């Protein structure tokens, strides 16, 4: 079996795809798209910062196009469809990351992962995290 991408490469790919789709679909909100889709960032704090920046670009693109009533340029009939695609795309890679960790003997239980994923995604603004 051929080895798949590393966890760092998966995070780099997620960041890249976000920025590429913003560039193609709402260029007025575009940020610099990395040259290499799979180039791993060795500094985890820097990778987290990059992921936050690309998430902001997606948010700005969707929000801007909804506010203006304008569709996306290339891929989607409605801006919400871009957000939907990002959710399932990143959910797919979230599963890959959990599998890589498990195969490497570093499995994360649902009890450990829940507060860091579902607990963040489902938290209402201003509410305390569930532990």
Where are these regions (language model features)?
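Short, contiguous alpha-helical
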Residues: 1-36, 73-131
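Helix-adjacent hinge/juxtasegments
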Residues: 20-61
């Amino acid at each position: 079996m051929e080895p798949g991408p590393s966890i760092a490469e998966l995070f780099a790919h997620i960041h890249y795809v976000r920025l590429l789709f913003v560039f193609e679909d709402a260029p007025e909100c575009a940020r610099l798209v990395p040259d290499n889709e799979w180039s791993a960032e060795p500094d985890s704090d820097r990778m987290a910062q990059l992921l936050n920046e690309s998430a902001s670009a997606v948010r700005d693109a969707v929000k801007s196009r909804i506010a203006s009533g304008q569709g996306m340029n290339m891929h989607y009939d409605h801006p919400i469809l871009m957000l939907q695609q990002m959710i399932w795309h990143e959910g797919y890679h979230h599963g890959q990351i959990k599998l890589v960790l498990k195969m490497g003997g570093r499995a994360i239980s649902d009890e450990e992962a829940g507060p860091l994923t579902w607990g963040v995604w489902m938290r209402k603004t201003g509410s305390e995290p569930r532990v």
